[in-house]
Structures are given as C-alpha cells and as structure tokens.
C-alpha cells in the first residue's frame, strides 16, 4: 500500500456525496466529517423525498435533530445551524433511478461539477424484505449510484459499504475477495442478475393479472426473495442482493477508483461522538431489547460460535481511512475490507445471554407503567434438537391445548391463547431469521484491514483520531458499560 497523506488535509475543501443519509451509519459518517474537518467544502446528503420541503424536514427530524449531534452542537453553540446550512446540501432523490431521481437540473449539474467523493451507504437491511424492493435498492441501486459517480468530473474515489455476510454460511477463514458477475455460493451455474429482475417482473405481472391484493403480492415477493437467495446459496435476501450489488460494481466500474467496505455486525459507538449511541433494533440488539422487556426466556446458539461485532464509529473511521488511502487509484483492482473483530478480538455468542442477565439483573428496565421488569436467567440451547423439544413442550403443545379449550369453552381462554401465540411467533421468527448465524463457523480474514491500520499508523498523524482496531475493546466492559446502557437509553426508552 502506498504511503498515505493526511486525512484532514484530504477532507479539506472536498465535496462528498453521501447516500442513505438518514441511516445510522451515514449519520455517524456525516457527524465525524463535520466535527473533525470543519473546512470540508460540502456534504451532499441524498434523502428519499419528492421535493425540497420534504427533504429538508427529513434532514432536520431524522438527521440533525438527533442526539448524535449533541457534541457538535456543544462545540459550535449558536453557530451550529448556520454551519450546517453552509456545509450541507440536502438532495431530494432516490438511488432506485437514473441520476438518482434528481429533478433539479441545476443541482444535478452542480454535483457533477463539484463532487470529489461518493460514499454509498444506502441499503435495505431487512432480512425478509420483498425481493423486488431489495433487488432494486441493494443491487440496482448500487449501479445507479456508480453511474452517477462516473459523471462527476472531479471524482477521486467511490466507496461502497456492503456487508461481510455476503459470504453466506461459509466455514473457516473467509477471505477479503470481491464477487464477480455470475458467481454463486453453492456452485450452481447460470446466476444472471437481469434474469432475476425479469423473474420478479413476470411474477408481479402474473399476480396483478390474477387480481391479487397488495398484501398477497407483498407476501409472495418476500417468499420469492428467500427462495431465490437460497437457490443460489445465500441464507437471506439481504445478503444475496448485497452480493449482487457488488457484482454489478465490479463489472461496470471502468476506471473509477472503487473500494468496498464490508462491516460485520454493527453495534453502538465505542467512543465517538460519545459511547453507546445506537439507533433502531439492529441484528444483535434483539437480545437485550426482548430480554430486557422480559420477553426472551431462551436462546439458541452454538457453543463455539464466534459472533463478529464492530462498533459503528470504528466502521466509519475505517471507511474514511480507506477512502483516503485509495483516492485517485484508477485502473487498479478494487480492494475489499472486512471491518470486524472475529480474527483480531473474537467473542463467543454464548457470552451474550450471560452478560445480558448480569446487566438487566442489576439494572432492570423500567416499563411505561414505571415498574421495573425483573428477568430470569435465559435458557441457552446448543442444538436444534434440544431447542425444538423445549419449544414443543413449552409453546406448541400448550398452544394446541388452549386452541382446543377455546373451541370447547367459547373462547374463554382467548387472551392466554393470543399471548402465547404472539410469544411463539416471536421466537420462531427470531430463530428463522438468525438461524444461519447462530451456528456460524466462519472467521472474517482482515489482512487488508490490518494493512490499512498499519499504513495509517505509520503515515498519518491523525491515526488516533480515526481509530478502528477492535483489539482495543474489552467486550465484557463494552457490553456492560456502553452497549447495553446505550440500547436501553436510545432504543428501549
């Protein structure tokens, strides 16, 4: 890797397009750039909106109105909003169409003239998303952003944020290698993205011709996403369509400098702008959220399963450092970076319920009725057979008994029946969604990322400012003092 220059000097007077601007990772990226380099020229933030007014409202409510920006607000005081007004341009549009669906011709031409960096953070991360929606956003959306980037006259780098789990359910060491057009995970030949698109269109046309309801079409599209993903070897539609998106970028990048960032499971901020900021219920947060509420009594996980976690601020820092490291590197093979912890600082999945028990026993969640929710120790099952036995005895059989009793006694037990049915559905849904990762035996190789860390430490004075070494994390300390309190404050409350 070539010697890196100063990150702050690189960001100075640069114009950056950020897609998916209302997403949590994009917000952390925006906050970091504005706080660390106030001399950045412009941040163009793409938000899904049809007009300027709607976009401006979303920008305030979903981005700068968030607590995430409290440190920047404290630093700038009364000048915060004038600073944001000067440095940020809201862009109403969508990554699902040509030229990002921009209607303002003058703004579009300004962006093509001014933009130096494009960072694509837009995605739908729903594991059970409709196939048509996921294909449009995660796959073709990436291509639309690339096409827009190619029209930017001053472009120095295009950074695409994907996910490490495009690897599917591989075992052993998973290398930081790109995906090329037509590659499937199970060795099946004939994977063609355009064919997948045509299959979706044909199915929707067939359903509409038959007079299917929107609810029926939605359900069919969700089922189709799962079926097509598994047909080619991926466990769910999210990672499948993200892999397809990478294939399109590799196929059509041309001479554009491209870097692909593949984070693992993203958790709350480790240090900046303050520890513990998290937004929404992400993958791993289902455990503390449902356990803290007293709704999760058991958990299924392999005894040797390593859960690969990485705080969001480290992902953003790695993205910025990679952006600087590969700027202006045209006609070279794009470098892919795994940003995770399983290789450098692994944590066993089985430690999670134990830490959750310790935290919520000492710090019970206070429910909306102002009552503390007392939790018991969750049962942890290390195999599907023991879990299925538990499920049958404690949920499926009682559910069947209540169903029969309801029929005999004119719905007398309806309340209990519906409550148990909800709990059963929740448990089955969580297991189905996360089943591929509960016994995951892969370790994400981070050799490229380690080289990037070394290059940053050797070449730039701001290496400590843009930290992303997971070896700095004590997982027990992080969960008990940072992540769980953050989930309670920003999600549960």
From Swiss-Prot:
Catalytic activity as recorded in UniProt: a long-chain fatty acyl-CoA + 2 NADPH + 2 H(+) = a long-chain primary fatty alcohol + 2 NADP(+) + CoA
Cellular component GO terms, alphabetical: intracellular membrane-bounded organelle
Xref: Pfam families: NAD_binding_4, Sterile
Disulfide partners: none
GO molecular function, a single term: alcohol-forming long-chain fatty acyl-CoA reductase activity
InterPro entries from the UniProt entry: FAR, FAR_C, Far_NAD-bd, NAD(P)-bd_dom_sf
Keywords: Lipid biosynthesis, Lipid metabolism, NADP, Oxidoreductase
Any Gene Ontology biological process: long-chain fatty-acyl-CoA metabolic process
EC number(s) from the headed UniProt entry: 1.2.1.84
Gene3D superfamilies hit by this protein: NAD(P)-binding Rossmann-like Domain
Family annotation (CDD domains): FAR-N_SDR_e (cd05236), FAR_C (cd09071)
First and last residue of the signal peptide: none
Similarity comment: family membership: Belongs to the fatty acyl-CoA reductase family.
Protein task: NADPH-dependent alcohol-forming fatty acyl-coenzyme A reductase that catalyzes the reduction of fatty acyl-CoA to fatty alcohols. The recombinant enzyme accepts saturated and mono-unsaturated fatty acyl-CoAs of 16 to 22 carbons.
PANTHER family per the UniProt record, alphabetical: FATTY ACYL-COA REDUCTASE 3, MALE STERILITY PROTEIN 2-RELATED
Stated name of the protein: Alcohol-forming fatty acyl-CoA reductase
């Amino acid at each position: 890797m070539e010697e890196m220059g100063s990150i702050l000097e690189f960001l100075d007077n640069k114009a950056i397009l950020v897609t998916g601007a209302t997403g949590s990772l994009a917000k952390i990226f925006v906050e970091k750039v504005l706080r660390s380099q106030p001399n950045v020229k412009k941040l163009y933030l793409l938000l899904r909106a049809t007009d300027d007014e709607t976009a401006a409202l979303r920008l305030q409510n979903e981005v700068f109105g968030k607590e995430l920006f409290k440190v920047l607000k404290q630093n700038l005081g009364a000048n915060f909003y004038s600073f944001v007004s000067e440095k940020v341009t809201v862009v109403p549009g969508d990554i699902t169409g040509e030229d990002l669906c921009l209607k303002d011709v003058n703004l579009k031409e300004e962006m093509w003239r001014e933009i130096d960096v494009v960072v694509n953070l837009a995605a739908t991360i729903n594991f059970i998303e409709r196939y048509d929606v996921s294909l449009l956003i995660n796959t073709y959306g990436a291509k639309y952003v690339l096409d827009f980037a190619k029209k930017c006259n001053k472009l120095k780098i295009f950074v695409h944020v994907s996910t490490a789990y495009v690897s599917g359910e591989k075992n052993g060491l998973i290398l930081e290698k790109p995906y090329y057009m037509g590659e499937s995970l199970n060795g099946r030949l004939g994977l063609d993205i355009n064919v997948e698109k045509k299959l979706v269109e044909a199915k929707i046309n067939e359903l509409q011709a038959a007079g299917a309801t929107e609810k029926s079409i939605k359900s069919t599209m969700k089922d189709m996403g799962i079926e097509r993903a598994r047909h080619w070897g991926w466990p769910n539609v999210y990672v499948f369509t993200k892999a397809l998106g990478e294939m399109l970028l590799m196929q059509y990048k041309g001479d554009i400098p491209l870097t692909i960032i593949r984070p693992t499971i993203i958790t709350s901020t480790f240090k900046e702008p303050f520890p513990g900021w998290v937004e929404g219920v992400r993958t791993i947060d289902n455990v503390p959220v449902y356990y803290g509420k007293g709704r999760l009594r058991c958990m299924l996980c392999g005894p040797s399963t390593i859960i690969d976690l990485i705080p969001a601020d480290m992902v953003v820092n790695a993205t910025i450092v990679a952006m600087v490291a590969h700027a202006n590197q045209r006609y070279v093979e794009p470098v892919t970076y795994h940003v995770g912890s399983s290789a450098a600082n692994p944590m066993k999945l089985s430690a999670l319920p134990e830490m959750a028990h310790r935290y919520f026993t000492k710090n019970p969640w206070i429910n909306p009725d102002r009552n503390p929710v007392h939790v018991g120790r969750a049962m942890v099952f290390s195999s599907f057979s023991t879990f299925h036995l538990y499920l049958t005895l404690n949920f499926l059989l009682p559910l069947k008994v209540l169903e029969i009793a309801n029929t005999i006694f004119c719905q007398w037990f309806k309340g209990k029946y519906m409550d148990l049915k909800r709990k059963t559905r929740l448990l089955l849904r969580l297991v189905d969604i996360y089943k591929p990762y509960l016994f995951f035996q892969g370790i994400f190789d981070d050799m490229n990322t380690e080289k990037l860390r070394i290059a940053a430490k050797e070449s730039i004075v701001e290496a400590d400012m843009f930290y992303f070494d997971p070896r700095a994390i004590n997982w027990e300390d992080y969960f008990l003092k940072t992540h769980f309190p953050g989930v309670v404050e920003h999600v549960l409350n």
